[in-house]
UniProtKB/Swiss-Prot annotation:
Source organism of this protein record: Carboxydothermus hydrogenoformans (strain ATCC BAA-161 / DSM 6008 / Z-2901)
InterPro entries associated with the record: Aldolase_TIM, Indole-3-glycerol_P_synth, Indole-3-glycerol_P_synth_dom, Indole-3-GlycerolPSynthase_CS, RibuloseP-bd_barrel
One example of a Gene Ontology biological process annotation: L-tryptophan biosynthetic process
Stretch forming the signal peptide: none
Molecular function as annotated in GO: indole-3-glycerol-phosphate synthase activity; phosphoribosylanthranilate isomerase activity
Organismal lineage: Bacteria, Bacillati, Bacillota, Clostridia, Thermoanaerobacterales
Protein name per the record: Indole-3-glycerol phosphate synthase
Pathway(s) the chain acts in: Amino-acid biosynthesis; L-tryptophan biosynthesis; L-tryptophan from chorismate: step 4/5
Length: 264
């Protein structure tokens, strides 16, 4: 399966990264960052928008995807991040996976230098090394995908993330995965409307799982396949605090205008 291929490539990239900067050194650098910069809370950023009667938008910087290919030929991460910030984004998501999404850890570093919004590292995180690296790059939150991690790994990675002053956006696609996320201690859960095995999207996935998340009292985010104001209204009515949008923005001629239209 394609997902397995991405995971295999990612594991190899992490192995190569550890050869350049050993695990202990990356961890030390990350721990030093804790006292150097106060992290920004993704959860609080979303809830602040809700207090104004709006949904919190995590606007994504994404050059390509395995299913759609290149989404934006000329992508300047710093410019797009600044446009998102001016256009009402609550937070910025930066894809750092290089081979299939044409992202880069350097994108995150560059974005950190130009915006004061919370930044989410979006990647296939399989090893604590990547969490320490995210901290060093300037991330405030990391995406942890439930289906890629054993329960014990997920719990440990949430603990490491929070120990560094960051937050974990724990991604799920089914009731079973939501329960796994809750058991691991997730307080911020993202429902991916995209099936990572087929890449098909349907916001009904988020709508069906909303009651379980509401009952658990977590901050709720809906990810992928959100294209219209009607979609946003349905998700807000269901109780979602935030939405993650990438493709609909980066494919637009003017990403900032596209975001403003969705939020109007």
């Amino acid at each position: 399966m394609f997902l397995e291929k991405i995971v295999q490539v990612r594991r190899e990239k992490v192995r190569q990264a550890k050869n350049k900067i050993p695990f202990w050194e990356m961890r030390k650098m990350a721990e030093e960052q804790v006292s150097h910069r106060l992290p920004l809370s993704l959860r609080q950023a979303l809830l602040r928008e809700n207090a104004k009667g709006k949904v919190g938008v995590i606007a994504e910087i994404k050059k390509a995807s395995p299913s759609k290919g290149v989404l934006r030929e000329q992508l300047d991460p710093e410019e797009v991040a600044q446009v998102y910030a001016k256009s009402g984004a609550a937070a910025i998501s930066v894809l750092t996976e290089e081979d299939y999404f044409l992202g880069s850890p350097e994108y995150l570093k560059a974005v950190r230098a130009v915006v004061s919004l919370p930044i989410l590292r979006k990647d296939f995180i399989l090893d604590p090394y990547q969490i320490y690296e995210a901290k060093v790059l300037g991330a405030d939150a990391v995406l942890l995908i439930t289906s890629l991690l054993a329960s014990v790994e997920l719990k440990e990675m949430i603990k490491i993330t929070e120990g560094l002053g960051m937050e974990a956006l724990v991604e799920a696609h089914s009731l079973e995965e939501v329960e796994k996320a809750l058991t691991a201690g997730a307080r911020l859960i993202g429902i991916n409307n995209r099936d990572l095995r087929t890449f098909a999207t349907n916001i009904d996935v988020s709508l069906k799982l909303a009651p379980v998340l509401k009952e658990a009292g977590v901050v709720m985010v809906s990810e992928s396949g959100i294209r219209s104001k009607e979609d946003i209204k349905a998700l807000m009515t269901a109780g979602y605090h935030g939405i993650l949008i990438g493709e609909a923005l980066v494919r637009a001629p003017d990403p900032g205008k596209a975001l403003e239209v969705l939020l109007a």
